[in-house]
């Protein structure tokens, strides 16, 4: 497992990808993840170059283990996130505590894990390209790293609204018009 880092571009976020499942090799995850993370940060008026995200590209078995270990749900899921800091809002539906780009401790936003089998199955069931679904999940996961969640209706409305806005900047359709299973 050798992490790959996107080509050095001073205006872009650093996205490190560790690929454990060769099925991910068919998708240009490096470019896709870079665009998704950058678009998320720009939408929140954060300079991408100030931040880092790490992604584990794994299979369903590995993510089921992680899901069981960290969430008590030993089943596959599409994406998991581990924020480097707790940025949760003070009240449901409120804005999270976004990082200060000038704070060197804020640089590492956290880690994401994506399961190829689950992502591919969900994309096929929804009739959407895998790249679009994975882009959405990286945007979704990056928002979790920044303190957004969907535990309450108010939080979900805020987070989903942002996801739609961000995906539109990437010329992608609203993923909530046809629910992903």
UniProtKB/Swiss-Prot annotation:
It comes from the Bacteria. GO terms for biological process: rRNA processing. Gene3D superfamilies: Metalloproteases ('zincins'), catalytic domain. Zn(2+) binds at residues 140, 144, 150. Disulfide bonds: none annotated. Its EC number is 3.1.-.-. GO terms for cellular component: cytoplasm. GO terms for molecular function: metalloendopeptidase activity; RNA endonuclease activity; zinc ion binding. Its main location: cytoplasm. This is Endoribonuclease YbeY. It comes from Dinoroseobacter shibae (strain DSM 16493 / NCIMB 14021 / DFL 12).
